[in-house]
């Protein structure tokens, strides 16, 4: 993705599980995005379920895709 200065950090809720470890996440502002897990979450075998609250990073250049960086308890 882009440099750290160009990323937006937002919170949302997992709405749907998609094939290939992708997720439909609805952000707090109501905008839907397609997200994938970051590498450290994959290596730690962290799984997401529908309804989980997550923190995502988005590029300022493409506001339709995101990366899940944290799953809230």
UniProtKB/Swiss-Prot annotation:
What Gene3D superfamilies does this protein map onto? Nucleic acid-binding proteins (2.40.50.140)
Per UniProt, the keywords (alphabetical) are: Cytoplasm, Initiation factor, Protein biosynthesis, RNA-binding, rRNA-binding
> Which species does this protein come from?
Chlamydia pneumoniae
Task: Specify whether RNA-binding is a keyword of the entry.
Answer: yes
A single Gene Ontology CC annotation of this entry is: cytosol
- Where is this protein found? Cytoplasm
Name of the molecule in the record: Translation initiation factor IF-1
Which gene is the coding source of this polypeptide chain? infA
The question of whether Cytoplasm is a record keyword is answered with yes
Residue span of the signal peptide, if any?
Answer: none
Provide the family line: Belongs to the IF-1 family.
Q: Which Pfam families match?
A: eIF-1a
- GO MF terms held by the record: ribosome binding; rRNA binding; translation initiation factor activity
Summarize the subunit comment: Component of the 30S ribosomal translation pre-initiation complex which assembles on the 30S ribosome in the order IF-2 and IF-3, IF-1 and N-formylmethionyl-tRNA(fMet); mRNA recruitment can occur at any time during PIC assembly.
Domain S1-like: where?
A: 1-73
Function recorded in the entry: One of the essential components for the initiation of protein synthesis. Stabilizes the binding of IF-2 and IF-3 on the 30S subunit to which N-formylmethionyl-tRNA(fMet) subsequently binds. Helps modulate mRNA selection, yielding the 30S pre-initiation complex (PIC). Upon addition of the 50S ribosomal subunit IF-1, IF-2 and IF-3 are released leaving the mature 70S translation initiation complex.
InterPro entries, per database record: NA-bd_OB-fold, RNA-binding_domain_S1_IF1, S1_domain, TIF_IF1
């Amino acid at each position: 993705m882009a440099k750290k200065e160009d990323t937006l950090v937002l919170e949302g809720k997992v709405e749907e599980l998609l094939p290939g470890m992708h997720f439909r996440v609805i952000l707090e502002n109501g905008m839907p995005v397609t997200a994938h897990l970051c590498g450290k979450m994959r290596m730690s075998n962290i799984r997401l379920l529908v309804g989980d609250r997550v923190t995502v990073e988005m590029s300022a250049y493409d506001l339709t895709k995101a990366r899940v960086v944290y799953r809230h308890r």
